[in-house]
Structures are given as C-alpha cells and as structure tokens.
C-alpha cells in the first residue's frame, strides 16, 4: 500500500462544441482529444451528470483498448476522479481492459460505473480515433437520460476539478495506491481474472479442453487484431482450454493496432480470411479493438453474424449456463436478419426486435426477459453481462463443436459448416449481406436518405412490383416505414432508427445513416432474403441477392446518383 496526499485544484475552462456522446460514447480524432482541457471537460461532465451522493466514495472501473493516448487519458481520469470525490478506481493492468471484462467487473464488484476508453473497431494511432464512454452500475452503456445530461454539462462547463498529486507511474504492477488516509484509492487489477471467473460459470471449460485433446487434428486460429483481447487470448485459449499458443496471432496490443483497422470482418482481417479460405484451420475467429465484436469462420466457410446468433440460440442446451437456467427470450437489432426470429418461434420463447445499440438489449436483460441477442455488425452476447462479447461468442462455438463431436474422431468430425447447414435444413436460410459506404460527405448522404424517406412517407412504394434482374422473380413491396421502437420495459420511444422496405415474400431492404466514424458519414444498406427450398440453400450469397441489391441501390435509392459511389468500402 502506497500512501500519499493530494489537494483539489480548480481549473477554469470553456465548452468545446460537438461533445455529444452517441450510442457508443464520444469518438473523435486523437488530435482533437489532445487539445488542452478537451478530454478534461468531458470527464468532468460525466461526474457532473452523476448524483453527488452516489459519486462520493464510489468505485469506478477504468480501462481501455490500448490505443494511442489511452494511458495519458487514464492518468487524467485518476486526477479528476479523486478531486470529484470518487473513493476507489479499479484500473486494468497496463491500462488494458476489454469492454466485456469491464462490464463483468462492474457487476462483480458492485461499482457505480465505468469509464471506458475505446473507439471500438475504429483505427488508432496519433492520427487515428479516440473514444470514451460511461457505463452504468449494471455494466451496460449509459441510457440517453445520462448521455444527454453529460452533453448538457459539456455545453456550459466553466471549471474542472482536478489534482496534480495523483498518478500511477507503472500500471504494469498489480498494486494498491492510497491518498489522504484512504479517502481515494487506485487498485491496479489483473485484466482477466474477474472475466475468466465469470466465463467458467457459463461454459464447460473442462469439456472443451477434453474436446481439444481428443481431436488432435482440430485446428484453431484466433486473431486479436492487435487489440485488447490479445491480453486475454493466451490466458483463455491456451492456459484454460489447452489450445496451442501458436494458434494465436496479433495478440500484442498495439497503440495503432499494428497499422491495421481492428474491425473483424472479411475486409479488415485479410490474413485470417485467406488462411480460412485456403482450408488451413477448422475454426478461425477474430475480435475487434475493445473485444466486444467477433467474426467466426469455418474451413472455407464464412459464418454470417446473423446466422451465428441463431445457431447459438438453437443449440442453447449445449451451453451449461442456458441448459441450467433456460432461455428467457431472444432478441436482435432491426437490421439483423430474421434468422433468430424463426428459432424463437420454434422454441416458443419471447422475441424482440430493437434498434441498433446494445443498451436496448440491456433493458430487456435487466427485466429478466432476454437471454441471447445479437447484431449483424459482428456483435453477439447474452445476459451474463450488459455488453456484446466477442470472446464469449467464440467460446460458444467451441462449446457447440464440443457438443456435436462428443462421439466423433478426426475422420467423422462435425464442422462449423455442417452445423450451420443442419440449421438451414431445419429453419430455412436467410441470405443476408450489408454494404457499407464509408466517409461520404454528409450532405449527399442525407439527400439520398431523404429521397428514400419521401417515397416511404408518401406510401408510393406499397404495392410496387419489381422484376428481378437475375432470377426473374417478382418482388412486390408489402410495407415500408421508418423504424420506431417502444421499449416494453420503460415505454421510452426511439424514432428514426432505419428505413425499412419489406416485400411480400419476407425479403427486406434497410437503409441507415451512421455517424460512428470521426469523419464523414457512413451509409449502410442491408439485404435479407428468406429461402426454404432445399435445392436453394447453398447458393453464393451475392448471386442469390443480386436482384434485391439492384432494386435497393438502383431502383429505389439511386445511391450512385446521390453519392457518386459505385462500390461499397465493405461487404459483409
């Protein structure tokens, strides 16, 4: 125990424009965040938005994904937290904590909340992005009532409470530091301990280890994409599950993610995708910068995130946590394919369709009505925490493989592809794809969305028929709207969550304008087509969706006309 003292200092400041946190907190360029008082203003505004009686003497968890400026920001948070009456900071070793691990720690240690330093899957480095968000005592993202309060304080802030006498020189040491006779404490904790303990209550680690041992030819590859889960990879996959350390790549967290884009998809994880397409591994997986997203691949087989959550749900009995406690309900974000809904119907459990944003799942979980959920954007999770969880999803699939291969050997091994195709044979297949058009100037992006919105508002699309350019099928629009969600728990209403066009055969086209990047806008277009014919379940996705894609991009939105873009940056 290192005992020291500090005094509170008041620093005058002025508001910065644009400090409005979104679904994933505040994300800005590093160069902007490093401006004098910029980050200090936002951190002080977080504390100003919290009830003073709850803040005083409270425990706050702090950590991040290790991107550039992470540890400088942590030292700043220490100083402002101490001056604002926080009693204890739990900080991850080296300043590293995955977002799922933070959620687990908050819940396990009854913390008031957490300050998470991450821009998730956005690039890092001196010219990259930086992010900060506040999570609540349930371990989940702050609701709009809190984020709006934070923003309001950023617009009127005049001073920052801080101190010059609080710092931890070496975050690599697992030690406890004390100031003012215990009035303020910083404890550097192991980044993985609480999280691994939780995972052991969910999965049969011994069973998975036995599966790995009994199938010596089973090959596995995990790509941490130089993000925070590199700090967890060896501990979980090698030490706990018996997978050779040589199967882990890019597991050294890097301030700029080793020059990469830590977004686990087919575009930004090219090395892993190439290896899997070459058939080098039975299972390949990747996680993003802060560890909440996942991509899973089988040998020469891409597992769509929408299918992944559906298969996990349909195999819930293979996972001890759900086999023991049962399924309370299933949910997906609106743009995610309808595959999960068919599982919910079959299992006779409640189903929820919510806007994009994990906080909507959190409300349902806190009310005890939701167990498993997912987003098409490579986010999958359950009620074990209140964030999506990339490592959890990967272990789910290891557990499912273990279940399906209890009596197999290397000759009759049941693969990821076979498990998914068994699922399609039972439930049908949702052919699904998402096109991302990134860093578009805001004005043309908004003009395109307005063009689609006007067609929806006028009802002129309802009953309109299109002939498929590739399949000659007739596509008739049954309904269209701007998705609105009324939360069944707190009755809050979330409007303008995405433009939906639904066809008579159940096919869907969805348009969304996203602002999670630090520059420009991203237009996302989603295509979802349901197929039950046995002879049509194994087609190429882009070929099968060609007609629907043409209708969406050319006939309805005229995307090229408005944005000048001929091709998306990312196809999922």
From Swiss-Prot:
Any single GO CC term annotated in Swiss-Prot or TrEMBL for this entry: cytosol
Family stated for the protein in its record: Belongs to the phosphohexose mutase family.
Keywords: Carbohydrate metabolism, Cytoplasm, Glucose metabolism, Isomerase, Magnesium, Metal-binding, Phosphoprotein
EC number of the protein: 5.4.2.2
Predominant location: cytoplasm
Catalytic activity: alpha-D-glucose 1-phosphate = alpha-D-glucose 6-phosphate
Family matches, as Pfam families: PGM1_C_vert_fung, PGM_PMM_I, PGM_PMM_II, PGM_PMM_III
Function noted in UniProt: This enzyme participates in both the breakdown and synthesis of glucose.
UniProt subcellular location: Cytoplasm
Annotated Mg(2+) binding sites: 120, 288, 290, 292
Disulfide bonds, paired cysteine numbers: none
GO molecular function term, any single one: phosphoglucomutase activity
Active site per the UniProt annotation: 120
Residues engaged in binding substrate: 23, 27, 120-121, 133, 292-293, 356, 375-377, 388, 524
Organism: Dictyostelium discoideum
Cofactors demanded by this protein: Mg(2+)
Top-level EC class: isomerase
Keyword Cytoplasm (UniProt): yes
UniProt name for this protein: Phosphoglucomutase-1
GO biological process: carbohydrate metabolic process; glucose metabolic process
Annotated cofactor note: Binds 1 Mg(2+) ion per subunit.
